[in-house]
């Protein structure tokens, strides 16, 4: 049966979420915008991801955390929901770490994507 599902993400930082979506080459739009399921059930989202089948998905901030909103029956992304969330959370964590290291005066020197899917980040800070 078609219905909108909320999936917990533990994502709290909007800018890092948007950077993570960009890093995964996922096109998104700022909200508020409405998404709906087959039966017309609607939900307003803060970040919208359009799908070719017109059953769009998105993120809504509830309390402190963003939740993924989707009609899972009509999921149309290149990955399963689980893989999508895993990759999104990895990129989100990477963005949080990178932003924090830059704020602390470090500079990114290099990043490597290993065969196992992990990301290796090399930073440095000059002391004067």
Curated annotation (Swiss-Prot):
Report the superkingdom from the record.
Answer: Eukaryota
Write down the InterPro entries for this protein, in alphabetical order.
Answer: Uncharacterised_Ycf35 (IPR009666)
Q: Is Plastid a UniProt keyword of this protein?
A: yes
Question: Where does this one sit in the cell?
Answer: Plastid, Cyanelle
Sorted UniProt keywords? Cyanelle, Plastid
Q: What is its main location?
A: plastid
Q: Name one Pfam family in it.
A: DUF1257
Q: Name one GO cellular component term.
A: cyanelle
What family name appears in the similarity comment? Belongs to the ycf35 family.
Write the protein's name.
Uncharacterized protein ycf35
Q: Name the species this protein comes from.
A: Cyanophora paradoxa
> Gene of origin?
ycf35
